[in-house]
Amino acid sequence: YAERDNWLSIYVEDNGIGIPKDEIPNVFGRVFYSSKYKVKQHRGIFGLGAKMVILYAQSTTNKPITVISAQQGSDKVYRFDIMIDTLRNEPLIKYQEEWDNKYKWHGTAVHVVMEGDWLKAKHRVEEYIKRVAMVAPYAEMHVKEPDGAVIDIERVTLTLPVPPKEGLPHPKSVDIEAVKQLISRNGDSPVSEFMVENFDGVGEETAANFLKSIGIDPGRNIKELNMDEITHMVTKMREYNEWRRPRADWLSPVGTELLEQGIRKTLEPEAVFATTRKPSSYSGNPFIVEAAVAWGGKIEPSDRPIIYRFANKVPLLYDEGNDVVRHVVDEVDWNLYKVKFPAPLVVVVHICSTKIPYASAGKEAIADVPEIESEVRLAIREVARRLRVYLSRKEKEKEAMMRYAMFTMFSREVASSIASILGIKEDQVLNKLKKVISRKIKYLEAIEEVEGDGEQQQQQGQA
């Protein structure tokens, strides 16, 4: 940045769906603001991330953030220069303008000036971009760094993951504060009607049965409930086991094929094996675990597996030691999967959910929730077994090549002796010898494969 050596000018632009004009000031200028009252998987809903950038910029350079956005099909492009009134938690609009959208552009562009040390941050920024490309192989990214270096990441596919749908919260997933907000927005209605209209998987009969079981009249007006009754109802909602399971179409996993493509593009390994587990849930929150292992190629050998962690397609760079993924990976007996360290092994885990259970407010590690831990363990074991099959085959191929080399080492001398005895050409004998050797090696490989399958089934029981 021209004014100061330690100031950085950061500009980010996408070609997404854009932000409605009236929402822009609040989205960027009000902490914990969200216009959503329904649930679905989000990379983020502008709760803290963008606001922390603005507040840091304010405190170090006293400059506003510039936001330019246009929705798809909009005739106008809108610009706001925004700061945050930290006392009132309100946006301060420093400048505002709009112009005709001549080129039918849509998306959002953000410009911010903040204090920073690029030399220290460079590695982490580049690593973050690399990891985004791993779970978004359909994205194209162009990054120009302060030192003039350019990172161009081309998309490797035009296939997109299925976007998440929006839905109502599950009754097991809400807290007292959320229910109070729902009550304040829903006016006068019977408690049973309130539950049917505001929670997923709750029909009239289910609502009536639940309310009767906790001693609340289904026909009573929701506004008549006092704080103790609301607290009692929410507590029992979490304990009740007759609710329908949370829907999984609120989620958008990367998908096995896209995950493999992203890993191949980013890490350039020798082999990749990925899986997407079936949907599961914890405390009424649906989630899906995806895992992959990458082996060899340009992966450097390490004394333990290198881990890449993602939550709702967002890379997690810090606090790995407190993450459930690190704990599970460290518990795996990799000897069962024919991995001997140091080894060129990477483990990738992506967890998507309507509510990621982070271990701390920093949102850099996922907590040890039993349901999630179990799914992570099963996913890693599944891809590790496929890696074991691959490594076993490689081992057998190597042994077969050594056998072939050993047999053929003296084949010419043997062929020469046989040819002189039989009075035929040496090449004719040599060709027949090679065919016999190949048949013999294939026969031995077939026997070993049958024996190996039995051994693998035994190990699979242990794993």
For each of these PLM feature ranges, what is it?
Residues 25-27:
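ATPase catalytic-site recognition across NTP-hydrolyzing enzymes
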Residues 178, 184-187, 198-202, 233-239, ...:
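Charge-rich (often acidic), low-complexity intrinsically disordered regions concentrated
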Residues 8-9, 21-23, 34-181, 220-233, ...:
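GHKL-type ATPase core
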Residues 17-18:
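Glycine-rich G1-box
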Residues 2-10:
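Short beta-strand-loop-beta element adjacent to the nucleotide/active-site pocket used for signaling
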